[in-house]
Amino acid sequence: MMKLIEFELEDVSFIGSGAFKTLKLPELTSEEKFLIDPIVAPTSGLRIQILDQIEKKGKNKLLLTNRKLFLFLRVFKAISQQYKEMKKGKSLKILIVTDNRPTKSILLQYCSQIFAFDGYEIYYQEDEPGESKISAPYGAASVALLEDINLIIVLTASHNELSWNGIKFYIDYPMPMSGDLFKEISNKALNFQEIKFDPSYKPIPIDAEKKNNDYVVSLISKVLEIKSIKNKKLVIWPYLGKARGIVTLFKRLGADIILIDEEINPPNPIKELREDKLKQVMESEGSEIAILLDADRDRIALYVKQNGEYNYYIPNEIYSALHNILAKDYQKKIINVRTIPSDLRGDDTSFINILTGVGYKHLGVILYFLLGIKVDKSKVDKAILYFEDENNNLRKIDNAKPLKRQLFDLIQKNSLFEEEFVIVMWEESGGHTLNILNAVGAHNIDSFRFDSKFPIIADKYPVPALVLITELIARGHEISKSIDWSIKGINRTIPAVDKQKIKIMNNFAKNDNRTILIKDKEYKVSALSDNINTIDIFQLKSNNSTLYFRPSGTGPEVRFYIFGDRETHLEELKVVFNYIKLHYS
């Protein structure tokens, strides 16, 4: 396959001629410091546009400069030092994995050399020589699924354009870094003057992918019997790479897979849809279901033919429909933990609705609360956590007790002492995670908590949901009939660097608890904040629509969301974000 982009490398000058190499680091500029230690905390690791566009001999080319490369090396070294200090230099093992981005090999190589010099055993996913590819969700979950490896680095920039790359890392738990620990690592990365490397490292192969697929098969068997996708022709289009883990899983479950081996930049199925290609492949192969995947497999879309018509579904629609079908048709009790700007069309069928800030650093706190697992105070302080009480009012929480009391009362009221609850944790951008929870000590509030027979994953892990919704579609369920189709949910962005993001949020804060008028339409404004009262999300609610906006944690932009009338939502969203951009930026 022809490469979508190619890039050139600047030469890196190392010192030393023995077994090890040393790199002297230049002083950081202010802009570089912000990239490593951003004002707006990232929702999931760091992402940096690693390739710069330059003009050379009259042609535009992409260049990986030393200064951009060195930012990644600083963060690798900081993670290594932090983990080494936490573990007192013992049991130093790391799994390093990547997606299929053009810069994957150079980052994998240098990352491995840095950790090898610091005394770590280096593990790779079984792959072609010199590669270690696995999906980001599988990489994150491996910290819970692999017995002896408690540090994972995933090199990915998710759905971002291919000139980007990034670092997600997991220590002990499959939950994104946040709070004090993330800050400590950023501070370390800022202060290095040199980094040492061991080029003679020998990675140890391990099949984390199979461990993950075994886990998925075991987990979904507690929700539904997978029977209707057997011998079903499924089209899978990974927008980058070959999605080996997901393809292998569906084949194991009996599906007949047609793989579209054609890459798209940016690798984002929510923004890029090639309907003509999909229809042509589906018609020629006799397939009715196509699965579209982003670069790191945590953002999915579906293209489905039912009743002679093709429909395209985005994550908000997929997950709301899945939850509604499981609740209505299969009598599952859903503990619905969702980010505030995600789809509200599954709320009515849920056992309880719990709303959080955007990202799994918020969602994961709720899971640990329910399981009685201690959560670092700095994580709770930075988390935005609410639940709906019996009157559908949002109650803010900074500890597990009020939420436990609400669930305890609901279980008592409905006599659900033996129920296996399906907890779903999901976000509007595509992340989804589910688990099975059992109530423990449900006759006494003091001993009440939840337990699970499955490993606890508190980061995005959408493959179980993907298998379940595919099975339900194969059984004849229709997404469009399982949610209120008169409502449409979508998001848009306006460009804004960190300082501009903060300015917009600060300027708009004066409208909290007020009603404002935008083009003859009234909106009630509510500010939603974390547990140290930093506002992270604004809600604007009219008589027939709900909008949100917040500073992005993954790029230089402010994100706007709307749930409104299918016919007018796009125009309404455009009016609102133009108004806010004009008056508050």
How would you label these PLM feature ranges?
Residues 287-289, 293-295, 303, 309-310, ...:
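Phosphate-binding and adjacent anionic-ligand microenvironments
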Residues 73-95, 220-231:
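Glycine-rich phosphate/diphosphate-binding loops that line cofactor/substrate pockets in enzymes
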Residues 89-100, 233-237, 333-342, 423:
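Short glycine-rich phosphate-binding loop at a beta-alpha junction
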